[in-house]
Amino acid sequence: MVGIDVPEPKSKCSDPNCPFHGDLPLRGQILEGTVVSDKAERTVTVERSFYKFIRKYERYEKRKSKIKAHKPDCIDVRVGDTVKIAECRPLSKTKNFVVVEVKGEE
């Protein structure tokens, strides 16, 4: 229904920015990360770790990026959960992603 292969949440919501029960189209990247903050209303902060090669030292360094994502009412997410987020139209100044699946706790 959403255009990607994820199970639909069991609970219903009336959020217009929900890709399952609202009318929010998804396009672009689909990423995975760990939730590090859920303090903002209907927003979670997802952290992704990756390695970057430093040519001068011929070594890798660990880097991380934090992405703000919209959390629909029908998806229950807590800090420490591994989630799948999908790119959508800009929902605010910093939110361009929405949570589509909870993989579980890390």
Swiss-Prot record:
Source domain of life: Archaea
InterPro entries the UniProt entry points to: NA-bd_OB-fold (IPR012340), Ribosomal_uS17 (IPR000266), Ribosomal_uS17_arc/euk (IPR028333), Ribosomal_uS17_archaeal (IPR019978), Ribosomal_uS17_CS (IPR019979)
Annotated SUPFAM superfamilies: Nucleic acid-binding proteins
Biological process annotations from GO: translation
GO molecular function terms attached to this record: rRNA binding; structural constituent of ribosome
Annotated keywords: Ribonucleoprotein, Ribosomal protein, RNA-binding, rRNA-binding
GO CC aspect terms: cytosolic small ribosomal subunit
UniProt feature coiled coil, ranges: none
Homology family: Belongs to the universal ribosomal protein uS17 family.
Assembly information from the UniProt record: Part of the 30S ribosomal subunit.
Described function: One of the primary rRNA binding proteins, it binds specifically to the 5'-end of 16S ribosomal RNA.
Protein name (record): Small ribosomal subunit protein uS17
Species the sequence originates in: Methanothermobacter thermautotrophicus (strain ATCC 29096 / DSM 1053 / JCM 10044 / NBRC 100330 / Delta H)
Record lineage: Archaea, Methanobacteriati, Methanobacteriota, Methanomada group, Methanobacteria
